[in-house]
C-alpha cells in the first residue's frame, strides 16, 4: 500500500521547487495524492477494511489542509498544482 522509494523520488523530482526541495507543499500534496490513490485501489478489493479507511480519511484531511495553505499563500502555485495532479478543485 505504501509507495516505493523510487516512486517517491520521482514525485519529489517532478514537483520540487528547487534542487533539494523535499518538503514544500507541492511535494507533500503530490506524495499524499499518490498514497490516497493507492489506498483507493486497495478498497476496491477490501471493502470492509475500516482501519485503513480511517487512515485514508486522515490523509485526505492532511492534503486538504496543505492545499488550503497553498491557496492562501500563492494562488498561481495552487492552480498549477491541482492541474498537474488532476484534482477536482
UniProtKB/Swiss-Prot annotation:
Pfam annotation, one family: Ribosomal_S15
Domain of life: Bacteria
GO CC terms in record: cytosolic small ribosomal subunit
A GO molecular-function descriptor: rRNA binding
GO biological process entries: translation
Record has ATP-binding as a keyword: no
Region (Disordered), start-end ranges: 1-24
Composition bias, Basic and acidic residues: 1-20
Coiled coil: none
Record-linked PANTHER family: RIBOSOMAL PROTEIN S15, BACTERIAL AND ORGANELLAR, SMALL RIBOSOMAL SUBUNIT PROTEIN US15M
Its job: One of the primary rRNA binding proteins, it binds directly to 16S rRNA where it helps nucleate assembly of the platform of the 30S subunit by binding and bridging several RNA helices of the 16S rRNA.
Record note on quaternary structure: Part of the 30S ribosomal subunit. Forms a bridge to the 50S subunit in the 70S ribosome, contacting the 23S rRNA.
The protein's name: Small ribosomal subunit protein uS15
Gene: rpsO
Amino acid at each position: 500500500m505504501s509507495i516505493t522509494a523510487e516512486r517517491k523520488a520521482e514525485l519529489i523530482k517532478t514537483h520540487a521547487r528547487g534542487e533539494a526541495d523535499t518538503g514544500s507543499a507541492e511535494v507533500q500534496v503530490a506524495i499524499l495524492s499518490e498514497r490516497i490513490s493507492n489506498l483507493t485501489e486497495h478498497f476496491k478489493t477490501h471493502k470492509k477494511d475500516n482501519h485503513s479507511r480511517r487512515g485514508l480519511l486522515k490523509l485526505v484531511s492532511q492534503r486538504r489542509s496543505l492545499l488550503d495553505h497553498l491557496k492562501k499563500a500563492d494562488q498561481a502555485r495552487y492552480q498549477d498544482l491541482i492541474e498537474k495532479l488532476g484534482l477536482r478543485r
